[in-house]
Amino acid sequence: MNKIVTIEGMMCEKCAKHAHDALSALGANVRVELNENKAYLTETTLTDEQIKLAIDQAGYTVTQIVNG
């Protein structure tokens, strides 16, 4: 399943990389777009809770997850 995750708190490219690395560590195929404050996960089996926890532990906040 594909997911679009809106992330609050990313301010720079280093922040985006940190969020990317947090999701990649869980095995996600992810692309993070700083200017959109979004992470795009493709063909993921991660639950919304797993995503939220990883982003929270990285120091950011998930404000929305859209399945699609």
Where are these regions (language model features)?
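Flexible metal-binding regulatory segments at protein termini and peripheral loops
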Residues: M1-G68
